[in-house]
Structure formats: C-alpha cells, structure tokens
Regions:
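Short, conserved micro-motifs enriched in small and acidic residues
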Residues: 24, 28, 160, 369-377
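Class I S-adenosyl-L-methionine
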Residues: 17, 79, 96-104, 117-127, 137-307, 311-313, ...
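Short Lys/Arg-rich basic patches
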Residues: 1-20
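Short, basic amphipathic alpha-helical segments that act as recognition/interaction helices
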Residues: 15, 24-45
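RNA-binding accessory domains that recognize and position tRNA/RNA substrates
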Residues: 5, 11, 37-57
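Core alpha/beta nucleotide-donor-binding catalytic domains of modification enzymes
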Residues: 48-174, 184-187, 193
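C-terminal target-recognition/interaction regions appended to catalytic cores
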Residues: 5, 40-41, 275-402
Length: 402
C-alpha cells in the first residue's frame, strides 16, 4: 500500500485526504481504487467528473451512467442523441464481452458487484440509467420462483435488493435525472406494495416521478410492454418552475417492419425439426382444448411477434417465422433478434460498426442478451422528451439570469 501511495502525484494524495476523514477511511478508499491495479486511471476518471453538471450548460453534452447495462440498450440510444457515458456496470461476463466489443469501453466499464463497489468512485453524471433486473417482479419470474419455493420481489436475495442499491448511488451522487425501466408487472407485484416502496423511496429523496407502461410495438414489430420511470430532482427542476415532462406520443406507423430485416436464406439449423414442430403443435392443441392460451407464436413476414424472452434459446416457440411450402417454421436468427429488439444500424454507426452491431458470443448467449434487453428506440423517444425538459430548464435559467 505504501508503495502505491508513493507512486501517486501529490495533488492526488491531497484530493484523497479531502474525500476521507482519517487514515483508516483513506486506506479503505484506496483499496477500492486498486481492485484492478489501475489507481491512477481511476483517480483521473473520478476527478475529471467533478465539473459543472452539463444539464446547466448548453455547450456540453449530457452525461449518463449505465447500470445493469446488459448489452447497452440505454447506451445505444443516449449516445445516438449526443450523450456521453461516463460509467458502466454489468457483471455478466458474456454481456460484458458484447458491450465492450460494441461500444469500445475499457476504463469506464466496471464488472464488479455494484453492491460492493465504492459508489463515491462513480463519476458525476446528469442521468442515471438503470434497467434493474426484472426477474424478481416479472410474471414469469414470480411463477417460476413460486414453483421452486423461492422468494421473489424484494425478498429475492440475489436480485431483489438491487433497486435499493440504486437508491444508495442516488444518495451519494445525487444525479439530477433518473431514467429507470422494468417489467409492466412492477406496479401490481405484491398487491402494489412493491411499487409503493419504489415510489416512496424515490419521492422521499426529493424527486418528481413520472411513470408509464409503453409497448415497444409502437415502433418495432414486437409486443413488449415495459414500465419506464423518469424522475427529476425537485431542488433543480422545480425551483420556481414546473416540470412539463411528457412521455412520447405513439406514431401512427411503426418505423420498422418484420420483413425489413428477415433474412432471405437463413441457415437451416434455425428451422424446427419435425419432432419439435409436432410436439409444439400437440402441446398447443392440448391447452387449447382446456381453454388455455399456451402455445407457440407463429408470425408472418409482416406480423407482430410476441415478447422475446431470455428463454428464447430453448425452443424459440414464442416467436416462430412462417416459411413457404412444406418447410417447418423457423426460429429467428440472432441477427434478426437484434433488429427485432431495435438495435438498428443507426446506433451501431455511432460506434464505428458500419454494417451493424456484430455477433460476438454464441447463439444461446445472444438470445439471452436480447431477451433481457431494453428496446433502444423506445429509450431514444423517451430521452428526447427528457432533453426537451433539460432545454426548457436551461431557457428558464437564462431568462432569470437576464
């Protein structure tokens, strides 16, 4: 530890002393910095972030952090709109592989357990983005956990307390804007108590809260309902003014059709075997006779698919593409799944991928990643409305200054 301290610049040591109270806390602070033996780089990252927040400065792009980032649904959209990502956290090694390949980040991408990470090391930012894990609250996740006798919601020991981790970061960094996403079941989970807890935790910290369930099928050919939560720090945005944020209006026509990205000659491995296709048909018929809606989801070239889940890799039954003639239906290819989830080329080009985001993990991992992701174009449309509120705030600031 002494050797590392001697390696630091005097101004870095002085800065550490200001951030801590005594030698013990200094030691703990420095240990958290050297988890990857890159103390100088980490110090520079944090110190560079301690500047005027860009939501106040029209000449500076807004900054954001990407928590529980997955493969970067938030990252794609906000960068496309001119934002600068200053910190990313994701602990799944396969998602990290995709994320780093797509966005090229090394220094600002962190794969620690965010619950154990020193939150004071997170750079200052304007927008905290988090699609916090939905399995503890989703209908499918709750059903599975109940069948296994496991806890769900906030009682889920592995993932249920990650929302409280977000609140811990809010307490330390106090971002002006929170931009959160989860499954639509969040509001009804545990008879509304889950949503009450979330609302109260955010509200008690002085944020004005806006929430809405939005179906991505307004923009992409997939039925995918998610709740989006946008929060503004009242001490900033409600000071002698009112927040006029509104969620985006739905377009009259989707931006992308299924046929626009279906491959003409996909590999035969994606076509269902006779055995699997017969099984799925018999399974669907059995449940149809019982009056249940369980079964496969067959869709034509210009239809709207069911929701793609992280389980799609198992048999693909939720989204099957019709084929001509005698051929059995087929699964989506990973490339088609990418476009169905809204990771279109306009986002990829922002990061130098002129032919779209490449597949860098196995088919199985790709399906899992897309099934767990947020749809970038929905994030983009909501962020446009957030930017409008930021610009309105800036205008009010300039008006008062004049």
């Amino acid at each position: 530890m002494d050797i590392l301290l001697r390696d630091l610049n005097p101004e870095d040591i002085e800065w550490i002393k200001k951030k801590t109270q005594n030698a013990t806390s200094q030691n703990k602070f420095i240990k958290s910095l050297i988890s990857e033996a890159r103390i100088k780089e980490k110090l520079q990252l944090v110190r560079n972030s301690e500047k005027k927040n860009s939501y106040q400065d029209s000449n500076t792009p807004f900054s954001f952090i990407d928590l529980f980032a997955g493969i970067g649904g938030f990252r794609s959209a906000l960068t496309f709109l001119g934002g600068k990502c200053v910190f990313t956290n994701e602990w799944n090694k396969y998602a990290i592989t995709t994320y780093k390949n797509w966005y090229g980040d090394e220094e600002s991408t962190n794969d620690d357990d965010i619950r154990n990470f020193n939150h004071s090391l997170i750079p200052n930012h304007d927008v905290l983005c988090a699609g916090f894990p939905c399995q503890p609250f989703s209908l499918a996740g709750v059903s599975k956990k109940n069948s296994l006798g496991r806890k769900h919601g906030f009682e889920d020991a592995d993932q249920g307390n990650l929302f409280d981790c977000i609140m811990s970061i809010v307490d330390v960094k106090r971002p002006p804007i929170l931009f959160l996403e989860n499954v639509k079941n969040l509001k009804s989970h545990d008879k509304g108590n889950t949503w009450k807890h979330i609302y109260n935790e955010i509200s008690s910290r002085g944020y004005e809260i806006f929430s809405k369930v939005i179906d991505a099928s307004n923009w992409v050919p997939q039925h995918r309902e998610r709740i989006f939560i946008v929060c503004f720090d009242k001490s900033i945005f409600c000071k002698d003014r009112k927040v006029n944020f509104q969620f985006p209006e739905f377009p009259t026509k989707r931006e992308y059709s299924l046929s626009s990205f279906l491959e003409k000659n996909p590999d035969k491995k994606y076509m269902l075997s006779d055995k699997l296709w017969n099984y799925l048909q018999n399974y669907a018929e059995k449940h149809r006779r019982k009056g249940n809606g369980f079964g496969y989801g067959l869709v034509g070239n210009d239809g709207k698919t069911r929701t793609m889940s992280a389980r799609y890799y198992k048999d693909g039954a939720e989204i099957l593409i019709e084929q001509d003639g005698w051929r059995n239906p087929r699964r989506l290819t990973p490339n088609e799944a990418k476009y169905l989830m809204g990771f279109h080329d306009k986002y990829a080009k922002c990061f130098g991928h002129m032919n779209g985001f490449p597949q860098v993990v196995s088919d199985t991992q790709s399906y899992k990643q897309f099934g767990n992701s947020v749809v970038p174009i929905v994030v983009e449309k909501i962020m446009i409305q957030i930017i409008a509120e930021i610009n309105s705030y800036r205008q009010d600031l300039n008006f008062k200054a004049a």
